[in-house]
Amino acid sequence: MSSTAGQVINCKAAVAWSAKAPLSIETIQVAPPKAHEVRVKILYTAVCHTDAYTLDGHDPEGLFPVVLGHEGSGIVESVGEGVTGFAPGDHVVPLYVPQCKECEYCKNPKTNLCQKIRISQGNGFMPDGSSRFTCNGKQLFHFMGCSTFSEYTVVADISLCKVNPEAPLEKVSLLGCGISTGYGAVLNTCKVEEGSTVAVWGLGAVGLAVIMGAKAAGAKKIVGIDLIESKFESAKFFGATECINPKSVELPEGKSFQAWLVEQFDGGFDYTFECIGNVHTMRQALEAAHKGWGVSCIIGVAGAGQEIATRPFQLVTGRTWKGTAFGGWKSVESVPRLVDDYMNKKLLIDEFITHRWNIDDINTAFDVLHKGESLRSVLAFEKI
């Protein structure tokens, strides 16, 4: 066991004291893990739009003060009573979608969701209903069961997977959310077939992972859609066959962008993916799916209280509207395989990293994210 096992650890963390305010670098206290919990020394964490979504006040489940972060990687520091699958020194990736392998969801091959700790996780607590984080005597909430914006975090043992110790932790931290989500939406949720046509709304990290998945699936046409044309080069690198800026399309009066797409692309696409979280582009994506068999997958998370709309005729005439969480991967068993795919050069990760920062620069990383200038910023807790 480590020298800190069983003790409270003082460490650095980026704390969100309230919504719509910069994160504050603080020294926090992290309590030892309880039964079926694992304390992890986080080495790397990435900044994701989901973190920004909560920090910006759009998350209906958003709780403050909180330690955000859900894409990360690190090394097990200590384990709680009853933990058999992990030991100090293991290289691990925290998982915001757990996998207990016991609940009715885990046993159902149709879903990758797990409900065992859903309520406590949504409430910002560990499974026993309490927090392991304090700062100056004040309790801090956990986030998505991960809280990777802390040098040490505590997670449930069903919210963690052990990965190949040869894999670079900086890189595989990204498999905790965005890349896995987009890639899996293609391969698992929609099962895109060879020769299919695909359109992707939003060319951030998730959208590019969708494109990567579509290329791997053998799609013959992959169209990237975004308002920021500087993203087109990356989209084509990952496999897009062409890119469109909707603002550059001259639409006849009364014609929608999706109607134009249907005209231009032989009745629409076999598969469409919305990776923005905008209810209007969700409708566009559905209505650009091919009549009779087109499938549209929602990946982006819309703001609290927003609703999607379309005419029922769009669905009656054979289109399917579906969504995905974490790309349909059953997390504990799948992420280690994705790491192996990366190590065997079947999966790109390095190319998603556009910025590297120290944790002290986390607010700059969020600024770059909001400006659309980054795919993934990776932050290190040790000086780089």
Swiss-Prot record:
UniProt-listed InterPro entries: ADH-like_C, ADH-like_N, ADH_3, ADH_Zn_CS, GroES-like_sf, NAD(P)-bd_dom_sf
Catalytic reaction(s) noted: a primary alcohol + NAD(+) = an aldehyde + NADH + H(+); a secondary alcohol + NAD(+) = a ketone + NADH + H(+); S-(hydroxymethyl)glutathione + NADP(+) = S-formylglutathione + NADPH + H(+); S-(hydroxymethyl)glutathione + NAD(+) = S-formylglutathione + NADH + H(+)
Top-level EC class as recorded in UniProt: oxidoreductase
UniProt-annotated location(s): Cytoplasm
Subcellular location, principal: cytoplasm
EC number assigned by the record: 1.1.1.1, 1.1.1.-, 1.1.1.284
Keyword Zinc: yes
Binding site for Zn(2+) 1: C48, H70, C177
Sequence positions that bind Zn(2+) 2: C100, C103, C106, C114
Keywords from the named record: Cytoplasm, Metal-binding, NAD, Oxidoreductase, Zinc
Co-factor note (free text): Binds 2 Zn(2+) ions per subunit.
One GO location term (cellular component): cytosol
Single Gene Ontology BP annotation: alcohol metabolic process
GO molecular function annotations of the record: alcohol dehydrogenase (NAD+) activity; S-(hydroxymethyl)glutathione dehydrogenase (NAD+) activity; S-(hydroxymethyl)glutathione dehydrogenase (NADP+) activity; S-(hydroxymethyl)glutathione dehydrogenase [NAD(P)+] activity; zinc ion binding
Needed cofactors: Zn(2+)
Record-linked Gene3D superfamilies: Medium-chain alcohol dehydrogenases, catalytic domain, NAD(P)-binding Rossmann-like Domain
Similarity annotation: Belongs to the zinc-containing alcohol dehydrogenase family. Class-III subfamily.
Subunit details: Homodimer.
Function as written in the Swiss-Prot or TrEMBL entry: Class-III ADH is remarkably ineffective in oxidizing ethanol, but it readily catalyzes the oxidation of long-chain primary alcohols and the oxidation of S-(hydroxymethyl) glutathione. Plays a role in the calcium flux to the cytoplasm in the ASJ sensory neurons upon removal of a nitric oxide stimulus.
Record-given protein name: Alcohol dehydrogenase class-3
Native source species: Caenorhabditis elegans
Gene: adh-5
